[in-house]
Structures are given as structure tokens and as C-alpha cells.
Amino acid sequence: MRSFSYLLLCCLLALAIPSTAQNYTLPLWPGDNPEPSKVVGPEIDPTTDANRIVSGKVTVRVTNVSKPSLAVYSPDPAKNNGAAALVFPGGSYIRLAYNIEGTEVCEWLNSLGMTCVLVKYRVPEEGHYPENVEDLEDAQQAMRLTRAHASEWHIDPYRIGVIGFSAGAHLAAVLSTHPDFQGKNVPASSMDARPNFQMIIYPGWLSGSDGKVSPSLQPTAQIPPTFLVQAENDYTAHVENSLVYFQALKDAKVPAELHLFTQGGHGFGLRPTDLPISRWPALAEAWLHTIHILGAPGPIGRP
């Protein structure tokens, strides 16, 4: 049964992943993970028939990720502008929405001339930062590997950001807040893990129990420019997550842009619908020009 589940996952990935060319795949940790794996069994797709179709297309999810990795999707060399983004799919830290919040995002980034680095971080895990640091360690390592390979992958090391969806949006915010975190089982590194920008899409876990930003995510002026999107009728990760985080960014004098929409729900990725929220990628592209990640170089903070 396990071998059949893995074969089914591979077939679904082949059918559902867009034509964007994957150039490299690297393990995040060439040897063992910093902590012993708690995952039992091979990678599988836990999607059921009831939630397999989103906006008329198949959705592929992955769980039991014990060997975290990154996959690099490079744009057409004629369009490559040197900018890049790490992509963290969501899935409640239980699974990863690998195509709707992963490979399809890479296809969009490549259309903008950007390199996409899709991060397959460890799931499921027992909680998330700060109770569990494995997700942050994977995110840090992915950013450091990307900067270390910047020349080889034709990337400007000072124009590398993060894009996260749902739980992945929380992970993006954690990385931006704690790029210098030192895991006790992780060798020290001089390579900076701080992103140059972050895009936080329908985030969860940013709001604390007191109605303010989570204490573990209290922004400082070192947080990079931030773009946020959420729907008011998001009943999975409520809109208060974006509201309190935006206010905390404003208080810390971090450049931030917030887009709230009446309808949209949760987990829509970039798939088009007849709702205004489907226009968020165009808003994000304009914002990337505003902060000079795209277009002429500008005053983006350098690590």
C-alpha cells in the first residue's frame, strides 16, 4: 500500500505540476537532519476526493517529509533579472500544498523573470516555532544555500525574498524575525539568512491571544519590506492575523502594504476566480517594482 501511495503521488505531481522547468534539487541537509526524524513512512499525498479540486484544477499535497529539500526553477535566461524568492507552501505544518502554493507560484515568478526556490520543509511536526524549531532551521538553511549558490544560479544575493502561504506565511514571518537563530544541532554559519522582502499570503498564527501580534513575531526595524493579502471571510486563518501584523510592522516603521478583500476564503493560491482577490498577483508585481526588487535597482536593505 505504501509503494502504491508513493506511485500515486508521483503520477499526480507529473500531471498537476506546470511546465516550468526545474533546474536543480538539493537536500537541505546533505547528511542527517539536525534532529532525529519523527516522520513514519514514505512521502504520500493525503488529499481526499473531497478536497482534491480547487478552482477547477487538481491540487497535490505532500506529507511525511523527512528529507527536506529545495527545488530551483529558473526563468528564461533572456528574462532573468536576478531577483529570486523562496516559496513556503502552506498546510498547517501537517502537509504541503505543493502545486497550488508551490510549483504554480514558481511558474508565476518565472514569468516575472525571477528565480523560484521551492522549499519542501519537514512536515508533519509537533507544533511550530517557538515550540518547534525544525521549520525555522529548514527555512534558514534554504536561504543560506540559495545565497551560497547565487552566482551559479544567476541570482542577485541582495534581492532574495520569501513568499509564504498560510502556515508557510507564518514560516516566512518567523524567518524574517529570527534569521540569526542558532539551533543547538546546527553548525554556525556566516551566510546571512535574512530575506530582502517578504510576501505574506493568508497567514495563520501571527496573532496572539491578546489580540496583538504573537510575542515571538514582534517586528523590529530589521524586518524587510512586507506585502500582505487576506480575505475577510477567511475562516481558516482569520483576517486578524494580517491586521495585527500590519499594525506591528507600522509601529516598527517597516515598509508594508496590506490588501484585504471581502471574499476569497482560504487556500486559493494564484488560481483565477471571478473574485477581485484573484488580482493579488498583479498587485504584488507592482509592489515588487515599488521596492525595486523588479526594475531599476533601489534602496533595498542589504544583509
Predicted regions and their residues:
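N-terminal cap/lid segment of alpha/beta-hydrolase-fold proteins
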Residues: 22-79
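Short beta-strand element of the alpha/beta-hydrolase
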Residues: 81-90
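Catalytic nucleophile-loop/oxyanion-hole region of alpha/beta-hydrolase
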Residues: 96-98, 122-154, 273-278
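Short amphipathic alpha-helix adjacent to the substrate-entry channel of hydrolases
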Residues: 99-117
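Primarily recognizes the serine-hydrolase "nucleophile elbow" in alpha/beta-hydrolase
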Residues: 137-221
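Short beta-strand/loop motif that positions the catalytic acidic residue
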Residues: 222, 228-230, 234
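Conserved alpha/beta-hydrolase "acid-adjacent" motif
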Residues: 236-241
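C-terminal catalytic histidine-bearing segment of alpha/beta-hydrolase fold enzymes
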Residues: 243-246, 250-303
